């Protein structure tokens, strides 16, 4: 137990330093325009505490009017395209803690894989993210959405499945973190990925896919409206 606590505080120390010195994290300014857009929105009207915070990469960032899919919940989407799970560790205080969420929905890590980050590293970063939540936002429930397959990147599907399995097994007994499968709904009865669930790039989900995701996610959301 003491060893685990020491590791956590070491990670906090590293990321706090990174917040002070951008040069210590090589992706400190990655996709800065998207982040600045969110920060500008916040300056005009900062979201009130207690939202269900959706964060992650483009599969969530491109989910337009997310709240309309969940009319019985108050949702805040701060996902952005191209993000890695390590980016959310770096921007943790500003993109997560600052909003004082009542619940978090996370879908992130696939971009890390696509850029050469190992399966083990992605898994460790996701665990680190959840450990930080346990410290700064104790008791706040977290939904970890499964990495979804894309027809345009079939070679990556086995790696995505492996990460999904690691996450599912690791958090199966957690009272705070819930793994939710949004992968299975994208396959037809023949095991194929219908084009209707993807936009023209065959990478990102379509409106039809988001409707399916919403049906799966909604039962896991807290009542916060």
Question: For each predicted feature, which ranges?
Answer:
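Catalytic His-Asp segment of secreted/periplasmic serine-dependent ester chemistry enzymes
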Residues: 151-225
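Extracellular/periplasmic catalytic domains that process cell-envelope and extracellular macromolecules
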Residues: 45-48, 69-70, 98, 136, ...
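N-terminal cationic-hydrophobic initiation segments that often serve targeting/anchoring roles
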Residues: 67, 96, 130-134, 168-172, ...
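Oxyanion-hole/transition-state-stabilizing segment in secreted/luminal serine hydrolases
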Residues: 60-69, 74-76, 85-123, 143, ...
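Conserved beta-strand elements of the Class I
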Residues: 53-55, 76
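Charged helix-capping and loop-helix junction motifs
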Residues: 120-129, 159-164
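N-terminal secretory targeting modules
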Residues: 1-53, 64, 68, 224
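A short helix->loop->beta-strand "cap" motif at the edges of active sites that frequently abuts
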Residues: 137-141
